[in-house]
Structure formats: C-alpha cells, structure tokens
C-alpha cells in the first residue's frame, strides 16, 4: 500500500501522524471502491461513513504546525464528527453539517425516511438546541462553545441535564435488560 508522510521540517518527527495520513489515504481509496460498486447496484443503498473524532497525536505536533499550543477551540474541533452520508438514490444534500456522534443515528434514520425511535426523535429535537455535545464541551445553536466546566445558560442547562438523565437510562437499560436470547 502507498504511504503518505510529512515532509520538510516535520519529516521523520511524527510517526503516528505519518501512519494516520497513510491510513486516511488507504481508507479513501477503499471508500471510493465501495461507492463505485454500490453506484451500480439497483437496490436502494445508503452508506454512512464517520469518524468519532480526530486522532490523538503528540501535542507538540500541533504546536509545530500552528506555531502555538492547541487551545480549547482546537480541542473542540478535533472532537467533531466528520461524516459522509451517500446514497445511490436522491437524498437531501447538505454541507457543513456539524454534529456530535450521539445525533448520527437520528440523522441517518431521517435521511433514509425510516421511522425513528422515541429516543431518536428526542435527539433530533435536542440537536436544534445543542448541535454538539462531547467530552470537551457543548456548542449551542448560536455557535457558542461552553467548556465542560463552564456554566450553561439556564435553558441549555435544563436540556443537557434532561439528555444526561435519558442517556443514563438508555445505557442502563441497554446493559441491564435481558437479551432476546435469555
């Protein structure tokens, strides 16, 4: 497989970045192959490719590239969920959609025009108030970021607290309910 690596002053200094770049290249080639195949298939097909966050690499890599230490805004940006939603039939097109991983299933079901669970419907509504909720913080509908220890506006705080309770309940039920085989 083809390898990709950093050049210039960064060459040979960040092997994890070189590995990441090579794997991104290989993944891109494989994704192209997959889409080429399914573009020829008659059965309606929807493909979702996503990453849950950008890779963790040495902080000094960012310092060397940016000329300054990474700040909270960069940390939040690294937690964004890059995704591609592709279909071999017409679906609504959108660019620049920013969301966190928790909303992806609701977006997928909505795009596929499939029935959503009550939980997914709730997430679709929450997405409007807080498009990004991750380990670094929360972004509101106005684009304002709040770090994990920052106070939230009252209405957003209530929405996020409701989400935490529902998430806890959802996870607990998932891991405490007997499986259909039991």
Identify the role of each PLM range.
Residues 1-177:
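Solvent-exposed soluble domains appended to multi-pass membrane proteins
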Residues 178-182:
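A short, hydrophobic C-terminal helix/tail in secreted or cell-surface proteins
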């Amino acid at each position: 497989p083809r390898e990709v690596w950093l050049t210039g002053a960064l060459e040979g200094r960040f092997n994890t970045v070189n590995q990441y770049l090579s794997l991104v290249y290989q993944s891109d080639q494989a994704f192209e192959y997959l889409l080429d195949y399914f573009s020829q298939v008659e059965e309606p097909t929807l493909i979702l490719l996503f990453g849950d966050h950008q890779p963790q690499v040495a902080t000094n890599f960012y310092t060397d590239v940016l000329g300054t230490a990474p700040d909270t805004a960069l940390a939040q940006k690294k937690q964004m969920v890059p995704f591609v939603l592709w279909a071999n039939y017409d679906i609504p097109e959108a660019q620049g959609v920013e969301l966190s991983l928790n909303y992806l299933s609701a977006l997928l079901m909505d795009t596929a025009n499939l029935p959503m669970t009550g939980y997914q419907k709730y997430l679709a509504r929450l997405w409007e108030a807080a498009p990004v909720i991750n380990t670094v913080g929360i972004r509101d509908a106005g684009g304002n970021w709040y770090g994990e220890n920052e106070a939230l506006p009252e209405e957003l705080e209530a929405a996020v607290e409701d989400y935490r309770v529902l998430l806890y309940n959802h996870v607990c039920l998932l891991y405490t309910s007997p499986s259909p085989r039991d």
